[in-house]
């Protein structure tokens, strides 16, 4: 610390000896610079040999790190003693001394870069030492620290950005990165090899069979260390998951499997599970599939065998969670389609069945082992909820299964029926089905299915029940109940869907009425239910569309008493645009009378709301009256084109009322009196006397003429 002492003396004795002290300080700094240069030369040689020339080098970086730390402390003390103010004084006295001090600071910065590289070199040597002890978690930690230092990712060391920038621009930086990636690859390879020794998965194929063996080490501590390190080191589990899915999970569900479980394999050091099954395609595969209880039991043995690798990787994820992400979708679908779908077929089987309880217990085990997420993977839960529905459908045998398949089809795949039966024809002959669009699933598939049923020859012996008796009723009941469930969201959100479902119900009603001679069970009630169901869903959609209009009109306000402003017209146009959008999707779908009735109802609600808003005004200026007249004109113009025939708009009950309101917006007091005509004029058809009086008070100033006109409105 001689250099530091020199500087102390410099500031303690700035008198006649000032020049001498400056020279001594300069000498101390120069000496320090020489020491740093010699040290950096040695460090540079060490780095070049390791990361540039790749020469044999057995020097430990610890020696350099200790020396670097000591030099850094000396430089810091030296610079701290001089300080910025002192440096300014020295600069005035000696430019050379100030330059030497700045050089010293730059050398300190370079020393920090060298120290950063030496730390990396030291960590690389620590990795080699940890690898020799086979401590994989320590190696994993060291590799993480290396990555942080190399890439500057969340490093805990106090390293300035400038040091990182200079370090990453050095020639040796790329070599250090390569060395890191080589070590990471070797670590991954080593972990995989050790994992494969602890978890041995093998498969032997024969001409007609396959034997799969899972041999898992019982050394839980070592196994968990390896598994945790492997899965945290960017491990790709695709190969492992594919093996388990293709060779274990799928066969356990789809095939009869011989299972052998040995907890004391290889002298008690391993657990072994052996699966043997045929790979020959059976002619009658459904008869050879295992019972669901066998499937569940075999699954439990598989999970029990693999539980040793199910380590916790973090607070929310286990190894089985990772495996589950790759296999659970296929596994759950297979369980549903090929294992659980075989529900009881008789009442006795149904009463004695424990399927729901068994499925719930099995699902809990999958959840407990973290293979599935109970909040996201609800396939098994949904199955238990729908168990009774599956049972009832099973009773109806294959015909109801076909019906369910038809019900699942898109309602919007539609076709035109009765193209020649226009509204005029139907009005003169109510037995005709009107021209409209019907879902192909109903018009083609479902009706053909029912026609095949009614055409079935009577092969049953006299006095025995018809095996297909009541099936038409069951089919229609299934259609009525299942379509609203299957297409619930679309029926609510897509207007065309609800109109199609209404048409489908009416078409099926028409078909039932045409087949009364076939003695369809419950014919009257079926007709009523079909009609009420179709009407119900159409009404829901019309009410929903009306609520949209009312929601828009809820913002209809008269902000200025003298002028209408732009907001009311914008809202009215928005309502008309909403009706136009509905027209675009509905115009060709329902029968003409259904379409007209629905739009008349929607326009009625819209016009009534508009009229009420106008009557809420207590004072209407001439300008506002003119603007209201123009606004009503927009409605009168746009509303009529919503119909096939513009003249059909007159069926809107409030249509004349709206036209009269437009007239009154431009009428004089005399015209008001004439239109009322002592209670027998045209206004009396739609307005009460109080309403007309209110409008006169709002439109005209308080004069004797207004008072006289009001007295005539009685």
Curated annotation (Swiss-Prot):
Main location: cytoplasm
GO-annotated cellular components: cytoplasm; nucleus; RZZ complex
GO biological process, one term: endoplasmic reticulum to Golgi vesicle-mediated transport
UniProt-listed InterPro entries: Zw10/DSL1_C_sf, ZW10_C, ZW10_C_2, Zw10_middle, Zw10_N
Subcellular localization(s) per the UniProt record: Cytoplasm; Nucleus; Chromosome, Centromere, Kinetochore
Pfam families in the record: ZW10_C, ZW10_C2, Zw10_middle, Zw10_N
Keywords associated with the record: Cell cycle, Cell division, Centromere, Chromosome, Cytoplasm, Kinetochore, Meiosis, Mitosis, Nucleus
Function description: Required for accurate chromosome segregation.
Family per similarity comment: Belongs to the ZW10 family.
Name by which UniProt lists this protein: Centromere/kinetochore protein zw10
Organism placement in taxonomy: Eukaryota, Metazoa, Ecdysozoa, Arthropoda, Hexapoda
Gene symbol of the encoding locus: mit(1)15
